[in-house]
Amino acid sequence: MRTCTALVAALTLGLAGCSGTPWSSDDKGTAKVSCGLVVDGSGSGTSDDTGVDVKKKLQETLLPFLDERHCSSLAYAPVTASSWNSSCRHSPVDLDPEPRTSTDDREVLRQRARNSAAGASIEMLNCARKQNGSDVLGALGRIAQTLRETQGDTGGDLAVLAVSDFEQADPEFRLSREPLATKAERTRAVDKLLAGRKLPALKGMDLYTVGYGKNPTRKPSTYEGFDQFWTDILTTRAKAHVHHDDE
């Protein structure tokens, strides 16, 4: 219980001082959004020295994201060696629960739900770290499918927060080994990755990234090819609306 309390407190601190995030908006509307979270459990996601400190980034960005995007629910997907088939699972959290009695305080219920969602994000991260690997594409596909299924006939907007450096590295494909300098090379690499795999059903979704391209082992001269590789997949082919944390 003490650990859980400390965790929630740490995550709540992320609400302060996070202006300028890619999802920041002056829109004060009340439209609700079904949201998803992709959590990278690969070895590069353990600290800022080896890549992206995913736990730290979650503490800094998750609650502001939920608040500023008016998320009504939060679903989860892990980045592991085989993200589609990973046993790391958590049911979507209802962030706007209906009061059961006339004396229930709706704002208190919402805060409890947000705290539960924050705690579940760390549970997902801890599980993913035990499976290692970095199938980012599979995680995006899994979260997109989950959101489509849970959305049902209610319509509404869909948004995904992906905390990952996007260094695809699974048993069948390692992005770091692919030449990406020319358009032809990038197209071959994209086709190679997508061979036998589903393109994430992200069409029309807002995809917000934290840690994108931040792996310190990647040479600065290779970033443009890396970025164009993912732009081809996410924007051109999947037709997502992508927002990176440095924009």
Language model features with spans:
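Solvent-exposed loop/turn segments at secondary-structure junctions
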Residues: 41-44, 81-84, 166-170, 213-216
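Von Willebrand factor
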Residues: 30-100, 102-156, 159-160
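Bacterial signal peptide processing site
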Residues: 18-22
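P/S/T/G-enriched low-complexity
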Residues: 210-247
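VWA/integrin I-like adhesion module and closely mimicked acidic/polar interface patches used
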Residues: 167-222
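N-terminal export and membrane-targeting signals
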Residues: 1-10
